[in-house]
């Protein structure tokens, strides 16, 4: 696991985009994408770029259960507004949160992932250490599944809704086992509220109580953090290859 420290989220997006360009130059064709505030600066770099993504396939991590794609709180809507409308892909896959049989939808999504192995997976991390919507206690062997969201996740996501009561209580999420099959993982985290989760992910025991800790076992993970999110990584009793990067403006 390589840790790259950056000045702020904007610089973090630039670094992530540089990593993507390197991956594309090596033949990457399928991107695993995330939502939320952490990857927005990365998507902004993609949108500003002259690169053409029309030969790429994207597979998103998750979607709320019960929201139409036209809802401005759906992740389908988020992706269109932040990336896909400006930069069309060959094919974009997201779980169908309105599927009549959501268990069958989860199985269908696993088949999509199997047919399109992910070359470059973007992740955020929740305050409780979740990746995707894989909450604490999720089996590391889990593939795409229906999730009952924890109160801490509902509260954290309520800032995107009119009220906390409007936040969906379930989601369909790519599982940890599926995420771990990705060839390369880039995790972005910004802000003091992520510091505990980052410390646990990097230095803590590998435990289902902190889902992101499983990333210690992946061969190619790059973590991009600002100083606040990295604030608990400095310790005289812990050793880690921390890279401080300064981008040219």
Swiss-Prot record:
<dbReference type="InterPro" id="IPR006148">
    <property type="entry name" value="Glc/Gal-6P_isomerase"/>
</dbReference>
<dbReference type="GO" id="GO:0042802">
    <property type="term" value="F:identical protein binding"/>
</dbReference>
<dbReference type="Pfam" id="PF01182">
    <property type="entry name" value="Glucosamine_iso"/>
</dbReference>
<feature type="active site" description="For ring-opening step">
    <location>
        <position position="135"/>
    </location>
</feature>
<feature type="active site" description="For ring-opening step">
    <location>
        <position position="128"/>
    </location>
</feature>
<dbReference type="GO" id="GO:0006043">
    <property type="term" value="P:glucosamine catabolic process"/>
</dbReference>
<dbReference type="GO" id="GO:0019262">
    <property type="term" value="P:N-acetylneuraminate catabolic process"/>
</dbReference>
<keyword id="KW-0119">Carbohydrate metabolism</keyword>
<dbReference type="GO" id="GO:0004342">
    <property type="term" value="F:glucosamine-6-phosphate deaminase activity"/>
</dbReference>
<dbReference type="GO" id="GO:0005737">
    <property type="term" value="C:cytoplasm"/>
</dbReference>
<feature type="active site" description="Proton acceptor; for enolization step">
    <location>
        <position position="62"/>
    </location>
</feature>
<dbReference type="InterPro" id="IPR037171">
    <property type="entry name" value="NagB/RpiA_transferase-like"/>
</dbReference>
<comment type="pathway">
    <text>Amino-sugar metabolism; N-acetylneuraminate degradation; D-fructose 6-phosphate from N-acetylneuraminate: step 5/5.</text>
</comment>
<dbReference type="GO" id="GO:0006046">
    <property type="term" value="P:N-acetylglucosamine catabolic process"/>
</dbReference>
<comment type="function">
    <text>Catalyzes the reversible isomerization-deamination of glucosamine 6-phosphate (GlcN6P) to form fructose 6-phosphate (Fru6P) and ammonium ion.</text>
</comment>
<protein>
    <recommendedName>
        <fullName>Glucosamine-6-phosphate deaminase</fullName>
        <ecNumber>3.5.99.6</ecNumber>
    </recommendedName>
</protein>
<dbReference type="GO" id="GO:0005975">
    <property type="term" value="P:carbohydrate metabolic process"/>
</dbReference>
<keyword id="KW-0378">Hydrolase</keyword>
<dbReference type="InterPro" id="IPR018321">
    <property type="entry name" value="Glucosamine6P_isomerase_CS"/>
</dbReference>
<comment type="similarity">
    <text>Belongs to the glucosamine/galactosamine-6-phosphate isomerase family. NagB subfamily.</text>
</comment>
<feature type="active site" description="Proton acceptor; for ring-opening step">
    <location>
        <position position="130"/>
    </location>
</feature>
<dbReference type="InterPro" id="IPR004547">
    <property type="entry name" value="Glucosamine6P_isomerase"/>
</dbReference>
């Amino acid at each position: 696991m390589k840790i790259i420290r950056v000045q702020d989220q904007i610089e973090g997006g630039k670094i992530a985009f540089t990593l993507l360009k390197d991956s594309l130059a090596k033949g990457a064709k399928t991107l695993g994408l995330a939502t939320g505030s952490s990857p927005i600066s990365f998507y902004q770099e993609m949108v500003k770029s002259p690169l053409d993504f029309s030969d790429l396939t994207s597979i998103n991590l998750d979607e709320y259960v019960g929201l139409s794609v036209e809802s401005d709180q759906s992740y389908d809507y988020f992706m269109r507004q932040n990336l896909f409308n400006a930069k069309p892909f060959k094919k974009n896959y997201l779980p169908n949160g309105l599927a009549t049989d959501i268990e069958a939808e989860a199985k269908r999504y696993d088949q999509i992932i199997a047919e399109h192995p992910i070359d470059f997976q973007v992740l955020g991390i929740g305050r409780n250490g979740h990746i995707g919507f894989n909450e604490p206690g999720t089996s590391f062997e889990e593939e795409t599944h229906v999730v009952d969201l924890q109160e801490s996740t509902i509260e954290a996501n309520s800032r995107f809704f009119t009220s906390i009561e409007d936040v969906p209580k379930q989601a369909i999420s790519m599982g940890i086992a599926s995420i771990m099959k990705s060839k390369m993982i880039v995790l972005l985290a910004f802000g003091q509220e992520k510091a505990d989760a980052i410390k646990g992910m990097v230095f803590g025991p590998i435990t289902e109580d902190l889902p992101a800790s499983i990333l210690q076992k992946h061969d190619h993970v790059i973590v991009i953090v600002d100083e606040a999110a990295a604030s608990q990584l400095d310790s005289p009793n812990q050793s880690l290859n921390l890279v401080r990067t300064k981008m040219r403006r």
